[in-house]
Amino acid sequence: MMKNILAIQSHVVYGHAGNSAAEFPMRRLGANVWPLNTVQFSNHTQYGKWTGCVMPPSHLTEIVQGIAAIDKLHTCDAVLSGYLGSAEQGEHILGIVRQVKAANPQAKYFCDPVMGHPEKGCIVAPGVAEFHVRHGLPASDIIAPNLVELEILCEHPVKNVEEAVLAARELIAQGPQIVLVKHLARAGYSRDRFEMLLVTADEAWHISRPLVDFGMRQPVGVGDVTSGLLLVKLLQGATLQEALEHVTAAVYEIMVTTKAMQEYELQVVAAQDRIANPEHYFSATKL
């Protein structure tokens, strides 16, 4: 059965971020994506200027009520949330999650707790980080912080891989069954590799791939693609190891393709066949 995912995150008209980054790769892996946009911007914010608007929180709820009215909400297998335009949007999203789970008790909630990177030009609204700590984390089945977000969620520094696994398990004690640490950065084993962790109460998997050097301007949307693809693989029945290995390879293929084409925006369409069938392989290690 094809899986249906309600993806609630940002949308850009030009380029790739949020749903505009994740939607096509997720579909390419065989999932139906129902994109519900928290913001509609001309382009992502790292250009330094953009136009567009943040959707009123009630807009999100109204759209989902429309899906419920045609009796299709029970076919939703998961809710994915990413970049929020406001903390109030987050509260509406949790209402949507409750509504979806009432219609389909098997449905999962995947929270990508985007909290902003001022140094990268990623700006989030006031109250969003607090929302994730207090409400998003305990409500989620799967949560996917990067290192900075992991430290905010567990409320202490994380200096190495062992501490990252322990921190992930602190989060698991508060609600989610699975934690993806999307980018270990300075807490990883190696400074010249891109490393991730996938952790449950009784398993921890580590994976690394080469960093792709884009100089000063790193492409945006890599985390959005990573979260979306991991959710698809897990819904399709992949093991933790299989899901982590496929996602790591698929994202690497997108990065390599983007660099080869000398582009700043992720080249998800050009890389589509290698998203489904990666040419590279990276082996995950059980810790």
Swiss-Prot record:
Belongs to the pyridoxine kinase family. PdxY subfamily. The lineage of its organism: Bacteria, Pseudomonadati, Pseudomonadota, Gammaproteobacteria, Enterobacterales. Its EC number is 2.7.1.35. Homodimer. Pyridoxal kinase involved in the salvage pathway of pyridoxal 5'-phosphate (PLP). Catalyzes the phosphorylation of pyridoxal to PLP. Substrate binds at residues 10, 45-46, 224. It comes from the Bacteria. This is Pyridoxal kinase PdxY. GO terms for cellular component: cytosol. Pathway: Cofactor metabolism; pyridoxal 5'-phosphate salvage; pyridoxal 5'-phosphate from pyridoxal: step 1/1. The keyword ATP-binding applies. GO terms for biological process: pyridoxal 5'-phosphate salvage. Its cofactor is Mg(2+). Keywords: ATP-binding, Kinase, Magnesium, Nucleotide-binding, Transferase. InterPro entries: PM/HMP-P_kinase-1 (IPR013749), PyrdxlKinase (IPR004625), Pyridoxal_kinase_PdxY (IPR023685), Ribokinase-like (IPR029056). The keyword Transferase applies. It catalyses: pyridoxal + ATP = pyridoxal 5'-phosphate + ADP + H(+). It comes from Escherichia coli O6:H1 (strain CFT073 / ATCC 700928 / UPEC). One of its GO terms (molecular function) is magnesium ion binding. CDD domains: pyridoxal_pyridoxamine_kinase. It is an enzyme of class 2 (transferase). ATP binds at residues 112, 144, 149, 182, 209-212.
